[in-house]
From Swiss-Prot:
This is Leucine--tRNA ligase. A motif ('KMSKS' region) lies at residues 760-764. GO terms for biological process: leucyl-tRNA aminoacylation. It is an enzyme of class 6 (ligase).
Length: 987
């Protein structure tokens, strides 16, 4: 044989489906989709009404979206797009059902991640962020994601920043009226601050601090009015304990601090400091944020995480009087156990509590020395203790196992029921931002209070005893430990009626729940407390001392009074300055103070403005909003990012997100499908719900919730490898060797032994596989197919590049069934499929449709492979069978399906082709394929009834393989009707 003949025989056919052809096909169809606006979603009105002949009228709206990415790194690895691919499959499927699908992608570009990346590279955040967006956009486009790119935006776009600041302005200019009815029909609603002012002006609502001095609202100065309104606004300024992170140079919200008291990003120590900051009054929405979870289709684990984070508890607000040199002061405490008031033997306030400004100059008489902490007077003691508390993290302060510290303040509080004089301590385990910053201590029923009481020699009174039938006895605890129980019989809890204390009260003999109800009624009638609801949730700390964030639309006058800028002044853009890096400190420098980068730009900070009373000098707020601000509402901007007149136009909102806009979201409305990680359960998802509810109350949107259905995708994990020093080595350079004695595979790198571990995919682990690598070596369709076939979408799964080839082979077999590899032309038959093919085809259509509805693409793929394998075994592939197969595969592997569809003679893209519908005449598995195995190897296949008798199946199986048994009776036959017969032959 000549060399020329050998070469001819080994050449690949011109139209074999391989990585090179896949890339050509994918680039071709992506260009066509872009040019033809294939994935344009049609709005009702406006610039985005054009749907390329597929307009909104008469079509059901379906809104599917992903949690948009941070463009803070160098791009994506194959673990990132799992959710994006899932939402794309769903979107393509719904388009083929004839629905008007809104599917778009934006970029969450402000905030700490982008700024830190810019610091690492030495470039301005805008430069690096825009470069990262361009790279990420390229990667996503190459993946074949069916986005309407007219709707793409980044949160740093001035047009987007304008509306983020506009929403802040609406929140700032609102208060929460507990008596107002919200649009859902329940009590409590955000209302314009002007309505509160009107109530003050008319006298309908008493002016705080002026209930008895006769002053009218008009008698107050502007600064006095603003101070009062600040206590009601949903966005407000306060001097309060915050999480100060010197290592990052900024304050953090509670949600951004780990359980170890470190920053979520960077793992720096976090300290409690009292600083003047912006906050949002999310606590006003605590009950609604819990109650409305019942109406949305979210994973139960996420709902539980939000319920626990919000932490609704029922108890009582109780007022204790604290005598000071400046007169009696009110100390409000919240307790879930008001039944234990009779067991209160001391009280404790946070080191940050305002009452500590009123400590006496000298110690009272007869104060034990160990209460004083070694200090000459209460003023020195409190000052020193406050400094010590500031140096601790919140985690350290509440650590149950840690040593209990504290000292006496020199003040006493009066128990409102018993009239007992209670020493008032300060202790760092009481946090100012939890409850009221003050607690009543009941050492007989609480371990922490008991430990504190033992340390300082304070009395212990037990007010609850075990239930008679519990098998327990109070004697087991007295003098040894507290009796901690939420049920039991109340004891030692009665007081006679006196003029000072009011009516008599006895809780003795009652169960705890009954005692709580009775004491709450007594507190309210006596005017010293009432039953109330409290939340673990704290108000949302909303300002950051960073450069890369949205500026606040606020300026301050010479007297420090804040003024909201008019909407016409928006957006307030960041000045483009070189000095953007935050001032960071030694991570352990708790005494450091934030320095906002914008404060260094005096030309920007100081402005001359006319806000309606003549031109004056004002000073801009130099804080910026947290990175959560832009992500709180971005889903609404997808509806029309070209609209310059509205955040979102009402008719468009109602079409895409309003109640009853389709059958999926029903009465609730909201985004029909939102895919993203569970790690955002108590951050982005909670904040978005809060903002949305404020806008709902104010009439800007018509659904009470932003996201009707939430789906949490799993994580793609990967193997990583280390050498014997424990250093990570490149995973793609590791060679797998033969199994060791235990049966486990061995691995080498550069000829040396390597160890394998399993976990995340990451740059530091040197096991990253990029989408670009997949495009080049397999094509985007194979990549999509592999990710969708790896397992259930909501479960984590291991990445193994070696397994990708299985998906490629499936696509190659399908391609060969449709396309002649030599000519590139379709070679299907127009003949009607046989009965067996029709049954398999229509059952596959029914089953794959159910899998797509249930977001189970992995099992849908498995069924499509079975159908394709059947077609491969036919002499000629019927068009009537393979075209439905192509349509069903199209949402998962769209490019190759478009190409095959085109070669089959169709002029239009299959993206809007109707989804196949099963012919019910052929649906139903009346027969199945039974496999006959001999010594574990398949030797025959039988088509048998699904209800075949096991004995009959055994007879048919033995007959089918009789020649292989050599006329001998088998030693053993195992029948698992109707699908498997395993035969062990005679020796």
């Amino acid at each position: 044989m000549s060399d020329n003949e050998k070469s001819t025989q080994t050449e690949e056919p011109n139209f074999r489906y391989n990585a090179a052809l896949a890339q050509d096909i994918e680039n071709k169809w992506q260009k066509i989709w872009d040019e033809q606006g294939t994935f344009w979603a049609a709005n009702v009105n406006g610039d985005l009404k054009d749907g390329k002949g597929r307009n909104a009228e008469g079509r059901t709206a379906y809104f599917a979206m992903d949690m948009f990415p941070y463009p803070s790194g160098k791009g994506l690895h194959v673990g990132h797009p799992l959710g994006y691919l899932a939402s794309d499959v769903v979107s393509r499927y719904h388009r083929m059902k004839g629905e008007n699908v809104l599917h778009a992608m934006g970029y969450d570009a402000f905030g700490l991640p982008a700024e830190q990346y810019a610091v690492q590279t030495g470039q301005h955040p805008r430069v690096t962020t825009e470069a990262n967006i361009a790279n990420m956009s390229r990667q996503l486009h190459r993946m074949g994601l069916s986005f309407d790119n007219r709707r793409t935006f980044a949160t740093i776009d001035p047009g987007y920043v304008r509306w983020t600041q506009w929403i802040f302005s609406r929140i700032y200019d609102s208060w929460y009226d507990e008596d107002a009815t919200n649009p859902s029909g329940s009590k409590g609603s955000a209302r314009p601050i002007a309505e509160l002012v009107a109530k003050f002006e008319s006298g309908e609502k008493a002016i705080p601090g002026h209930e008895s001095d006769g002053k009218q609202w008009s008698d107050l100065t502007d600064a006095e009015q603003q101070d009062i309104l600040n206590d009601f606004r949903l966005a407000y300024i306060s001097k309060s304990p915050v999480n100060w992170c010197p290592g990052l140079g900024t304050v953090l919200a509670n949600e951004e601090v780990t359980a170890e008291g470190k920053s979520e990003r960077g793992n720096f120590p976090v300290f409690q400091r009292e600083l003047r900051q912006w906050s949002m009054r999310i606590t006003k929405y605590g009950h609604r944020l819990i109650a409305d979870l019942d109406g949305i289709n979210w994973p139960e684990k996420v709902k539980l995480m939000q319920r626990n984070w919000i932490g609704e508890s029922h108890g009582a607000s109780v007022h204790f009087i604290v005598a000071t040199a400046d007169g009696d002061k009110d100390m409000e405490i919240y307790t879930t156990r008001p039944d234990t008031l009779f067991g209160t033997t001391f009280a404790v306030v946070s080191p940050e509590h305002h009452l500590l400004e009123n400590v006496p100059a000298e110690w009272p008489a007869d104060v034990p020395e160990d209460w004083k902490g070694g200090y000459a007077n209460p003023v020195e003691a409190v000052k020193a203790y406050r400094l010590a508390a500031e140096a601790k993290t919140a985690k350290d302060r509440v650590n149950e196992a840690g040593e209990k510290t504290g000292l006496f303040t020199g003040l006493y509080a009066t128990n409102p029921i018993t009239g007992a004089k209670l020493p008032l301590f300060t202790a760092d385990y009481v946090l100012m931002d939890y409850g009221t910053g003050a607690i009543m201590a009941v050492p007989g029923g609480d371990q922490r209070d008991y430990d504190f009481a033992v340390k300082f020699g304070l009395p212990v009174i037990y007010t609850v005893t075990p239930l008679p039938d519990s098998g327990d006895d109070l004697a087991n605890y007295e003098g040894k430990a507290p009796f901690v129980s939420h049920d039991g019989i109340v004891i030692n809890s009665s007081v006679e009626a006196t003029e000072a204390k009011g009516d008599a009260l006895s809780l003795n003999g009652l169960r705890v729940d009954d005692a709580i109800a009775k004491v709450n009624a007594w507190l309210e009638s006596a005017g010293v407390g009432k039953g109330t609801v409290s939340y673990r949730l704290r108000d949302w700390l909303f300002s950051r001392q960073r450069y890369w964030g949205e500026p606040f639309p606020i300026v301050y006058g010479e007297d420090g009074t804040p003024h909201l800028l008019p909407d016409s002044a928006l957006p307030i853009n960041l000045p483009d300055v070189p000095d953007y890096e935050p001032r960071t400190f030694d991570p352990m420098d708790a005494e450091s103070n934030p320095e906002a980068p914008l404060s260094r730009n005096e030309d920007w900070v100081k402005v001359e403005l006319d806000l309606g009373d003549g031109k004056k000098t004002y000073y801009r707020d130099t804080n910026t909003m947290p990175n959560w601000a832009g992500s709180c509402w971005y889903y609404m901007r997808y509806i029309d990012p070209t609209d310059t007149k509205h955040m979102v136009e009402k008719d468009e909102f109602d079409y895409w997100m309003g109640p009853n806009h389709n059958k999926y979201s029903g009465d609730e409305g909201g985004v029909d499908l939102y895919i993203g990680g569970v790690e955002h359960a108590v951050l982005h998802l909670l904040y978005s719900r809060f903002w949305h509810k404020v806008l709902f109350d104010l009439g800007y949107v018509d659904s009470a919730e932003p996201f009707h259905k939430l789906f949490n995708q799993g994580m793609i994990q990967a193997y990583a490898y280390t050498d014997d020093r424990g250093q990570y080595v490149p995973a793609d350079e590791v060679v797998e060797g033969p199994a060791d004695a235990s049966g486990e595979p061995t691995f080498t790198w550069n000829g040396e032994h390597a160890n394998r571990e399993f976990g995340k995919m990451g740059k530091s682990l040197k096991n990253i596989v990029t989408p670009d690598y997949m495009y080049e070596n397999y094509g985007a369709d194979t990549f999509r197919l592999y990710e969708m076939s790896m397992g259930p979408l909501d479960e984590s799964r291991p990445w193994n590049t070696r397994n990708v080839v299985g998906g490629m082979r499936f696509l190659q077999r399908l391609w060969r069934n449709v396309v002649d590899e030599t000519t590139g032309q379709a070679h299907v038959t127009e003949d009607t499929p046989d009965e067996k093919t029709l049954k398999l085809l229509n059952n596959t259509i029914a089953e794959v449709t159910a899998e797509m509805e249930g977001m189970r693409p992995n099992t849908a793929i498995a069924k499509l492979i079975v159908l394709n394998n059947h077609l491969t075994g036919l002499k000629a592939v019927p068009r009537a069978a393979v075209e439905p197969l192509i349509l069903m595969l199209a949402p998962i592997a769209p490019h190759i399906c478009e190409e095959m569809w085109s070669k089959l003679g169709h002029a239009e893209s299959l993206s809007a082709e109707p989804w196949p519908v099963a012919d019910e005449r052929y649906v139903g598995h009346d027969t199945v394929t039974a496999v006959v195995q001999i010594k574990g190897k398949v030797r025959a296949k039988l088509e048998v009834p699904v209800d075949i008798d096991p004995a009959d199946l055994e007879k048919q199986a033995l007959a089918a393989v009789a020649d292989r048994l050599g006329g001998k009776e088998p030693r053993k036959v195992i029948v698992k009707a109707p699908k498997i017969v395993s035969i062990v032959p005679a020796e």
